[in-house]
Structure formats: structure tokens, C-alpha cells
Amino acid sequence: MSKVMIIGAGGVGGVVTHKCAQLPEIFSEIILASRTESKCKAIAEQLDRPISTAQVDADNVPELTALLEKERPSLVINVALPYQDLTIMDACLAAGVDYMDTANYEPLDTAKFEYSWQWAYHDRFKEAGLTALLGSGFDPGATNMFTAYIAKHYFDEIHELDIIDVNGGDHGYPFATNFNPEINIREVTAECRHWENGEFVETPAMSKKASFTCPEGVGTYSIYRMYHEELESLTKHYPTIKRAQFWMSFGESYLKHLEVLENVGMTG
């Protein structure tokens, strides 16, 4: 059993906290921390077991380090904004705490994300005897594990890899994102990159469209090629890959609203 600190009290933070609370044999103590502690308390009230909450500015390394040193968790699960990955990693190094996140770092003022900034921490975490587990959501995360599994158990080499992210549900809203709206819009409107013969090739955002029929009667969906961070890590660790692409489905209503936001200058 161990103590975990979850940083971030948005939609993803709420889901992570609920899941950790269901596993007391693994997470014996939970601390949920955010810049706005009232959001943490609102999540805590929904749970079947008590957890602690705290206020912290994840951009402030000394403040976060002090909280980590006070609480001494075994692990930090970072589900704050990707802009804050590096400061949280710095605080974990200073306090001697293992680190996990679900999305790689991107600068606040530039819609560009890549692993180089976080991979640069590798030696420091290794020398400190700490673990930093990056991209541990579904995509990236589960998609990486699926790839590793088939590479180990089914194929001698992987030459082409297509990751297709389809949401088979319908929440009924004309426009709503599944995670932080700002990050979602930045991701969708960024230049597309896919791996082709040893290098990344850039194409305009959402310019490549295809139709995909999901198995088990889920349905047929329009999918669009876009860049996603696991393409960077998978092509690094599986050098036999000649082509790697990431695709995501979007409904017509979502695309219509996104176009309006672009036309009025709210996505740049």
C-alpha cells in the first residue's frame, strides 16, 4: 500500500481520483491537489472513502516541492495541464518522488508538443533512483502497450502502424471535448505529422480523411489523420516501422463548430 498525490482537479483528475479510490489495497492514502482547492473538495465529496485535499500552484516549483516534502507520497500522478509537466518533474526530483503523467509537455505559447523536453530528464531521474513514467493514459499509454504486446507475441517486425481513435458514444452536445478544450483544439488544429521512411512528414491539419468500420458492430466513422505523441516514442523504440499514422474520428457538428472558432480567430 502507498500514498499517492494527484495533481489536477479537472475532468481527467476526477476520473483518476475515483479510480484510485476504488483500489485502497494499492492507494492507501490519496491527496488531490490543485490551484483551486474547492474543485478538489467537490471531487472528494463524491467518493466512498475519505481523501485529503490541498492547494498548490503547479507552476511554482518551491511551493510544490514543499507540499511533496510535507506529504511524502510514493507517487505523483500529474493530470494538470501539459504546460506544467516540467515544473512538476522538477519538484519530484527535488523531493525524491516518482512521477507519472498522461500527456507530454508543450510550451504555453506554442502549440507544439514533443518528448525531447521530458526525455532530457532521463539521466537525472535515473541517478536519483526515481521513475518517471510518461504518457500513461489511453493514447498514449494503452496504445503503446498494445503495440509492444503484438511486437513481442505476434510479429517479428512491425512495418506499418495505424492507431485509430474512435469514440463510439454520443453525449448529445453540439460541441464538447473529451478533455481540456484548449489542449484539444490546439492538438486538432496543429500541423499533422506522420512517420514515413525514417522521418516525420508534415501535412496540413485535418487534410487526410478516411472511412473506418469498427469491429463488433460499433459502426463506420470518418477519421482524420493527425499527429499524436506516441508516434514519436513508438518509432524510436520500434525502428523497423516504415510508416506510422494516428487517426481520430470527429462528428460533423464538432467540425462545424471548430471551423467557426477558426474563422473568428479563437484557435490560434
Where are these regions (language model features)?
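Helix N-cap at the beta1-alpha1 junction of Rossmann-like dinucleotide-binding domains, i.e.
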Residues: T36-S38
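Hydrophobic/small residue at the entry helix of a nucleotide-binding pocket
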Residues: V12-V15
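Conserved Rossmann-fold cofactor-binding substructure of NAD(P)-dependent oxidoreductases
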Residues: A58-R72, A80, Q84
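C-terminal catalytic/substrate-binding lobe primarily of soluble NAD(P)-dependent oxidoreductases
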Residues: K152-G268
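Rossmann-fold cofactor-recognition segment
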Residues: L47-N60
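Short beta-strand element of Class I
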Residues: E29-I31
